[in-house]
């Protein structure tokens, strides 16, 4: 028996709420606050709903499964971008949302390799996870990444990811995104 779109969204909201208890490793906020801030910045910038949802759910792979995935030395789930994207594909989210989520780690690797100042501005935790994520891209990887149709959108997700680490920022809670998620799932049904 498959879940209704409303039930799928309730599961996601429950996962988001539970992430309140998870440290956003190396930062002064929790995982929920980070996710909500990223979505807030996306929405405030005028991004479309798929971008807002990708920003909201980009770190879902750290906490969407009860099973144990390979760890990045205490810095979260290795390949969390793929774990989260695949989880959302299974729920019926669009390929664009999944690809944007997969692309946020590649965007970090790209920016580190193409902007000397970017690495200096990363938090200690983000620098540490970069090692597990493949380090800076080489020239060939950069060219391939730049050829992606969603290249610029992946960089935007990454920018919101970096910005979404503020303490005491008041933003809407997970329920604010319920209707957006339900409509997205309805639009993407075959």
UniProtKB/Swiss-Prot annotation:
Domain of life (superkingdom): Bacteria
Keyword Methyltransferase: no
Activity modulation comment: Inhibited by EDTA.
A Pfam family the protein falls into: HD
Stated consequence of mutating residue 58 to A: Loss of dioxygenase activity
Gene Ontology molecular function: hydrolase activity; metal ion binding; oxidoreductase activity
Effect noted on mutating residue 80 to A: 3-fold decrease of the catalytic efficiency and 3.5-fold decrease of the affinity for (R)-2-amino-1-hydroxyethylphosphonic acid. 2.5-fold decrease of the Fe-enzyme molar ratios
Cofactor: Fe cation
InterPro entries the UniProt entry points to: HD/PDEase_dom, HD_domain, HDIG_dom, OP_Dioxygenase
Subunit structure: Monomer.
Protein task: Involved in the degradation of the organophosphonate 2-aminoethylphosphonic acid (2-AEP). Catalyzes the cleavage of the carbon-phosphorus bond of (2-amino-1-hydroxyethyl)phosphonic acid to yield glycine and phosphate through an oxidative mechanism. It reacts stereospecifically with the R-enantiomer of (2-amino-1-hydroxyethyl)phosphonic acid and is also able to use (R,R)-2-amino-1-hydroxypropylphosphonate as substrate.
Protein name in UniProt: 2-amino-1-hydroxyethylphosphonate dioxygenase (glycine-forming)
Gene (name only): phnZ
């Amino acid at each position: 028996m498959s879940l209704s779109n409303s039930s799928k969204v309730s599961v996601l909201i429950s996962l988001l709420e539970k992430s309140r208890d998870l440290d956003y490793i190396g930062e002064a906020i929790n995982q929920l606050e980070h996710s909500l801030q990223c979505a807030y910045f996306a929405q405030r910038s005028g991004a479309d709903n798929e971008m807002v949802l990708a920003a909201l759910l980009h770190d879902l792979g750290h906490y969407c499964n009860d099973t144990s995935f390979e760890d990045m030395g205490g810095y979260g789930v290795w390949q969390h971008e793929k774990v989260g994207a695949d989880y959302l594909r299974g729920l019926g989210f669009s390929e664009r949302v999944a690809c944007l989520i997969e692309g946020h780690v590649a965007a970090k690797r790209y920016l580190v390799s193409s902007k000397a100042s970017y690495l200096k501005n990363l938090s200690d935790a983000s620098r540490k996870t970069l090692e597990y994520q493949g380090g800076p891209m080489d020239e060939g990887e950069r060219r391939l990444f730049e050829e992606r149709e969603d290249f610029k959108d992946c960089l935007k997700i990454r920018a919101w990811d970096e910005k979404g680490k503020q303490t005491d920022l008041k933003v809407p809670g997970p329920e604010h995104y319920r209707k957006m998620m339900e409509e997205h799932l309805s639009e993407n049904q075959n």
